[in-house]
Regions:
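Flexible loop linkers connecting adjacent transmembrane helices
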Residues: 78-106
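Alpha-helical transmembrane segments of multi-pass membrane proteins, especially transporters
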Residues: 11, 15, 35-42, 57-65, ...
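Membrane-interface alpha-helices at helix entry/exit sites of multi-pass transporters
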Residues: 52-56, 96-113
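Helix-loop-helix hairpins and the membrane-proximal interhelical loops
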Residues: 1-55, 134-136
Length: 136
């Protein structure tokens, strides 16, 4: 029984680390969204299942990729593709912050906002677990 628990835990840890890597890539590369990775993983899911990878590990990859993506997706919009000074007012707030020298502060506040949203959503996970039962 304990071996089955360790087997599942090892797959979830591997999925977590793989998802963190994929989320970092999708968050840093402009135009490469986390939904693309989720779609690719869902398309490859039958092959992954036939290789013995549990469905919970595939779901763990998707969830961890999405979580890391939310923390990092502000960085390219704040630090890349900055317009000229006369165009900055008509574009994204991240560009205005970059031109005024406050891009690092904007990235930090975006990460804090993502972290706060994550912490505030944790009680909802408990409610969903109670509402849907132990076997999600």
């Amino acid at each position: 029984m304990f071996d089955a628990y360790l087997y599942e835990l090892s797959w979830m840890l591997a999925a977590l680390f793989f998802g963190v890597g994929m989320g970092t890539l999708t968050g840093i590369i402009p135009g490469f969204h986390v939904n693309n990775v989720a779609l690719i993983l869902l398309a490859l899911a039958p092959g992954m299942l036939s290789l013995g990878i549990p469905l919970s590990a595939i779901a763990g990859i998707i969830v961890s990729t999405g979580t890391v993506h939310t923390f990092l997706n502000y960085i390219p919009s704040a630090l890349m593709g900055a317009p000229d000074a006369d165009q900055a007012l008509s574009l994204l707030p991240g560009h205005r912050m970059l031109l005024s020298g406050n891009a690092a502060r904007g990235v930090a506040w975006s990460a804090r906002g993502s972290q706060l949203g994550l912490f505030l959503s944790l009680p909802l996970i408990i409610v969903a677990r109670i509402a849907f039962g132990p076997e999600l």
